[in-house]
Amino acid sequence: LKTIRRQMRECQEDVAAYSPNALVLIDYPGFNMKMARWAKEHGIRTIYYIAPKVWAWREWRVKNIHRFVDLLLIIFPFERNYFANKGIQAVFEGNPLEDAIEARRTTLPSPEAYRKQNGLDDRPIIALLAGSRRGEIRDNLPLMARLSEKFPDYQFVVAGVHWLDKSLYEKYMTGSSIRYVCDQTYETLAAAEAAVVTSGTATLE
């Protein structure tokens, strides 16, 4: 909590020193809605990209978007009407994942090359996307590890991320045959027959 408060203060100081015409906030509503409020209180126009998912939960946050956000840039088409009905100007920009995935599609290795690169055998692959935060790994990977025991004819590959230490994953993979690869999420998905995915951005990917 102290770290977040310090980062908030540093952001506010940097924005004040720069004195921008507008502040563009991207996702992360727990932090950025507080920044939006601060910006409005200091006469700075606010533009918010990737709207908080108020249509799914904690809908009361709509009133804060209405008060503190001048322009909302949205990634889902249905959000346009939703926010319009709430009196909020929203412009559909689409999801950046579409472009990111399309750009990667042509550079992905073949399933055979992926297997060879990561020392995998010829059994069908099931990708495990347990999340990108410590808490998600803790909550999801143990269940995924137990699942792997029920399907010995498949090889399970957990897609890790570089900002979480490999030992965090290994802690929950002990005694299982799960393989670990790092920063190869798209490659792993492309080579897999199926995937077990923690709900979130990875589901859309």
State where each predicted segment sits.
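Active-site and donor-binding regions of nucleotide-sugar-utilizing enzymes
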Residues: 1-118, 129-140, 150-153, 161-163
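Structured loop/turn residues at beta-strand edges in well-structured enzyme cores
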Residues: 18, 67, 121, 176, ...
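Structural motif
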Residues: 21-22, 125, 194
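Short loop/helix-cap segments at secondary-structure boundaries that form the rim of catalytic
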Residues: 80-87, 167-175, 205
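Residues that mark the start of a beta-strand
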Residues: 125-126, 155
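Donor-nucleotide binding loops and adjacent catalytic segments primarily
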Residues: 134-193
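Short alpha-helical segment that forms part of, or immediately flanks, the ligand-binding pocket
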Residues: 186, 204-205
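Acidic donor-binding loop of glycosyltransferase active sites
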Residues: 190-203
